[in-house]
């Protein structure tokens, strides 16, 4: 880990927390991202950031003040593990299917959700036999509007000291980082070529990202950086800074791009107040960088350490997720610097080859001189 000892820029923290709250107060599940997407688009309209949807409902936000510059893509997803309502059994009884990855032990009788729309409280009654991840729930009262999905009944957003707690840090924190970075670059009038990408249905197999990659919706020469919250694992520490994610459970990401991120981060440590970073392979899950990489895009990743991953709390109880505000603010500060450093990609990534060539020259000389017959 690398760290500066001074305090972080307060404006980044304020922007990050404000965006995180706006997004996290919206209910979302795979295929039901309307509220989070609407809030993201509303922010873009408020600040004059050009945004559009593709035919699959993924959001593209573009800040292009340097058209000849290599595009930088910042990718996050709008959904979080949740339930789809499959059918109604009675005035207050519903069958719900869970979409996402959570261990079976967490689906206990009495587990509470909120049916959407309407935020109607409901409790898990039983697991349906022979039906994978399907459960019967009973609502506290008969919903006035037919529900179509449900989310865990947890606090939406709470700021406690330096931590954001809420139902869906994953990956609305990533979405907040995308938008905060674009806004920061816009305020600086930076000459950058950045595409913010907010995809759908990541929790059920990167479905939004796969449609984007397969449709060729991004420039092939782009550098794609996946932004995530990732399960805290040994070797990284919450509050220790943004994590340069060199790989995930399925893939190792582009070496030169990871080196570029580290070079920019190292420069930022030297000049920034309170910036810190860590470097690790985060194998707790698979992120969208794997999907983009498999379709031929040069990909890298950043993440922050996540507590209660996918709402999996202690003692097999559903609980709010949490992240460090300092880590997320550091992610945004790094991304702002990365976007502005894109013209120096070759120079920064060329440092290692140049060092190795210097070592090679010395090696040839020293080895020849010390050769014993």
Label every model-predicted segment.
Residues 1-373:
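N-terminal hydrophobic/helix-forming segments and targeting peptides
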